[in-house]
Amino acid sequence: MKRNLVESAVIFCISELMPRMRTLEIEISLKNLKSEGVAGWCYEGENNRDFYVDLDKNLTGGELLTTVCHEMVHVWQSATRKMKDMTHGRKMYMGKVYDETTAYEDEPWEIEAYAMQGDLVKKFGEEYAI
């Protein structure tokens, strides 16, 4: 059930955020992330078409869907090069470099992901009648 929800949500987010990107490789894993203190995370592989998304397997349906949508915004940010990982824990977002001293809630890529996740969840619910 969870795997089907995740796969449907990933396909939906790609169609909403990146409909013309046909060469994305996204590997999704459901893991126990409770000890990490996160619901999920996304990281880039070899290039900006290769991504890994880890999701906490303990999340409920609504939490899981929200987390998938949030992480898929990060995939979109990286695939479009709006956000780039750099060395030493730094990220570039829209041409500006941020380091590890930037608080999580002040990171512009997180602000954007939180702002977009709700609309994606709502549209997914409407399209899939959940």
Residue locations for each model-derived region?
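Auxiliary, metal-adjacent structural segments of Zn-dependent hydrolase domains
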Residues: M1-E46, G61
